[in-house]
Each structure stands twice: as structure tokens, then as C-alpha cells.
Amino acid sequence: MDGRDIKEPVPVITDGRYLEEIYKLQKELIDHYIEIEHLPMYPINVNPKSSQVMIKDFTARVIEELAEGYESMVLIDELSRKNFLWFGDYSLDDLSQAINHLQNVSEEMADAMHFLIELLIYVNIQPEDILKYIKSSRQGVKIQNEKDIIQTVMYIGGAEETFNNDILEEELVQTTNILEKYLRIFGDDLDESNFDIDFYRAGSEFGSRIYKSFKKALWDVCYHLNIARNFLKNKPWKQSEMMTDEIRFQKELVEGFISLMGCYSILGLDSKTLFHIYFKKNRVNLFRIRSKY
């Protein structure tokens, strides 16, 4: 079962508060996980060893999901190069395979979002804290819509990742939208009730610049999350204890969130589409909980 199997309509968010709604939905899942996995109630004190083990586990889960999503992108890259970037004569079977890999990209990105939001909830970083940090750390950036924090952070993260990537000029030229190619060929035969188009948008615009930028952006997420982990000094084997520098710890987690939103921006997602794939995967997880999967 995956997000495509969920037929429940995605809630319409009219005020732009997608991030707040994601926090709400994630807390509903956590409340179940507290009972199933015997997790502590949120928020937690980050200093005890048990808390730090849990935090490091969550950061590892985020990184694992991102790696799985990137693995699908590597497969798309191989198929695209094999088929001359989908120009001229190309294999329709390979195009269908690429579309299936695109769907998995969205699934894994939604999973990464779940784990990072769960981590932020546990360490008591709220949406308003992220907005406050953005305002203080990016004072030269004009915020267009304070209510839509995801879109704001996507804009900032995406711009920073694009600016920081050294891409050759010739790599900026040719891109191909794999989803559009697929729909032009197979669109008339698709059952719209079983083809959730929003699950195929992430990474559908293929090009060297986009994929190289995404790979670099992934490292930025991993870097900030691992630097945050490094502030957690109370290893299970240590007999002495150290207080956590919580300001610097939380700063790195928020920077990791900004970089993750930059990744999603590079993939062509916006706040509405990200919420769509998050919600569908949220419902998959809720089904698994209720069915004792």
C-alpha cells in the first residue's frame, strides 16, 4: 500500500498554513506511536541519554528516506540518458519505469518530511519558531507571505541551493518534463481516479542542473542534521554528562529544515503539492496503525 491507494480527499488549506496543519497531523500519528513504540510524550528534555539516542535515531531516519528517494532519481537519470533525454526514439517501457520511479521519489520525500517534523515536535521547534529564525537570519530577504511558512522557506532554501551550485552553462539548457511526455502518450488511457498526478511531480523536470543541484542540497540537509547531532554529547557509553548547547542545536535543525525545503523546491514542489503527498502518506501510516500492520 502507498499514497496512491488513499482515496480520502486532501483537505483544502485556504489560509496558507500548510506547515501548521502538517504539525497537527503528525502529532496525531505520534500519539499512536507513543502507545505502540513506547515513545515519551513530546516535547522532551534533550539532555538525558535516552532523549539523545531517540533524536539521533530520527535524524538517521530522515537521511535514510532521502537516500532512498535519491536512489530512485539515479535510476531515472540512467533511464533518461539511455533514452537520449526522451527526445527522438525512446522506449515506452523505460518511460513507464521512469514514471514509477518518480512516484517513489514523492513517497520517500513524504517519509522524510514525516520524520523531520516528528523530530521538530519532540525538540519543541514550532512553525512560528522557524519563521522567527528566518526573519533574524535572512534579514535581507523579503517575506511575501508569512502565513505560508513552507512556501517562504522553499523560496529561500531553493534560491540558496541554486546560487551555491557551480553548474556549467551548457547544463542549464536542456531539460525534459518526463511527466508531460508520459501524459501525452498515455494520458487518454489513464484512469484519473487511480492516477494521482501530484505523486509524479517531484523530479519530473529532468536535467543535469536540476539533478546536480538536488544532490548538493541533500548533502546540506545531512550536514546540518549531523552537526545538530554533534551537539548531543551524552553518549550511552559515557559516565559523565554534558549540557546541550540548545540554541546552536536548534539552529542546525532549522537550517536542516530550510535545506530540505530547498530540496523540495529543486524537485518542483510547492507548499500545496508537498502537503498533498504528505497527507496521503500520513493516511497510509494511519491505516497501518489501525490495521496493526
Which residues make up each language-model segment?
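Flexible "arm" and connector segments at domain edges
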Residues: D2-Y293
